[in-house]
Amino acid sequence: MAVLRVLCGLLLVSILFLGFVLSEGNGPKVTEKVFFDIEVDEQPLGRIIIGLFGKTVPKTVENFKQLSIGTTLKDGRTAAYKGSTFHRVIKSFMIQGGDFTNHDGTGGFSIYGERFPDENFKLKHVGAGWLSMANAGPNTNGAQFFITTTQNPWLDGKHVVFGKVVEGMSVVRQIENMQTDSRDRPVKSVKIANCGHIPVDVPFSVSNTDAAE
C-alpha cells in the first residue's frame, strides 16, 4: 500500500512538471532579442526586451533587428528606430511605434524598400506583450509595429506576429496607461532613446500566453 502511495505521488509530480514545461515553452522559438530604452519627456522610464522568432518569420525579424541596430540602405537613407516614438496608444489594445521619419504613423520604411509582403500568419495575437507588424492593408509592411496589451484574435491573418516581450512588460503597461489626445497620441513624448541587438546563444521557446508582468 505504501509503495502504491509513493508511485501515485511520483505520477502526480510528473504530471505537474510536464504541465509546467508545456506551459512555459510550447510556443515559438526566440532566436534573437532586441532592447528598447524608453524615455518619457526626456526622463528614463525603463527597458523593454523583445524576443524575436527568427525561425518562423526570418525576413520580418531581420527587418526589425536591423532597424533596432540602425542601418544605412543602398540608397543612402538611414533606417533606425533610435529616436523614434510610440505615436499611438490605445488602452486594452496596443501601443504602436516605428515611424522613424514622420513620428506620426504616416512614415517609416523597411530595409527591403518602402514596403515588403506579409511573410506568413503562422503566429497569432494570443495575449498581451506580443509584437506584430502594423500595416495599411495586405503586403504593406514597412517599419511600424505594435505591442499588444491584451488578446486580439481579430488581427490574426491580417498582421504578422514575430516577437514577444520577454522583459519589461511593466514598461509597456506604463505606456499603455499614459494620457492620450483625441487621435490616440500620447500627450507626453514616449521615445525610444536607445535600442539594439542582444545575441541569443541558445534559442528558447516561449509560452502562448500573456507576457510576464
Swiss-Prot record:
Domain of life the protein comes from: Eukaryota
Entry EC no(s): 5.2.1.8
UniProt subcellular location: Endoplasmic reticulum lumen
Domain PPIase cyclophilin-type, chain residue ranges per copy: 35-197
Regulation: Inhibited by cyclosporin A (CsA).
tRNA-binding in keyword set: no
Top-level class of the enzyme under EC nomenclature: isomerase
A GO BP entry: protein folding
Catalysed reactions, semicolon-separated: [protein]-peptidylproline (omega=180) = [protein]-peptidylproline (omega=0)
One Pfam family hit: Pro_isomerase
Secretion signal, residue range per the UniProt entry: 1-23
Gene Ontology CC entries for this record: endoplasmic reticulum lumen
PROSITE patterns cross-referenced by the UniProt entry: CSA_PPIASE_1 (PS00170), CSA_PPIASE_2 (PS50072)
Keywords, in A-Z order: Endoplasmic reticulum, Isomerase, Rotamase, Signal
GO MF annotations, alphabetized: cyclosporin A binding; peptidyl-prolyl cis-trans isomerase activity
Keyword Isomerase part of the UniProt annotation: yes
Motif Prevents secretion from ER in this chain: 210-213
Family: Belongs to the cyclophilin-type PPIase family. PPIase B subfamily.
Job description of the protein: PPIases accelerate the folding of proteins. It catalyzes the cis-trans isomerization of proline imidic peptide bonds in oligopeptides.
Name of the featured protein: Peptidyl-prolyl cis-trans isomerase B
Source species of the chain: Schistosoma japonicum (Blood fluke)
